[in-house]
Amino acid sequence: MREKIRLVSSAGTGHFYTTTKNKRTMPEKMEIKKFDPVVRKHVAYKEAKIK
């Protein structure tokens, strides 16, 4: 089953993306580079739980 996750910016701006991932095939925490419009740069986004 795919679970909803939140990708939080490592730049500390508070910006986040939401996405889904398959926990069975990817049990580790996701980390991906995406664009942060607050700092207008590509930064690392790390997985966090949706509250």
Curated annotation (Swiss-Prot):
Coiled-coil region list: none
PROSITE patterns: RIBOSOMAL_L33
Taxonomic superkingdom: Bacteria
InterPro entries according to UniProt: Ribosomal_bL33 (IPR001705), Ribosomal_bL33_CS (IPR018264), Ribosomal_bL33_sf (IPR038584), Ribosomal_zn-bd (IPR011332)
Metal-binding in keyword set: no
GO cellular component, one term: cytosolic large ribosomal subunit
Record key words, sorted: Ribonucleoprotein, Ribosomal protein
Keyword hit for Kinase: no
GO BP: translation
Single GO MF descriptor: structural constituent of ribosome
Disulphide linkage map: none
Similarity comment: Belongs to the bacterial ribosomal protein bL33 family.
Protein name per Swiss-Prot or TrEMBL: Large ribosomal subunit protein bL33
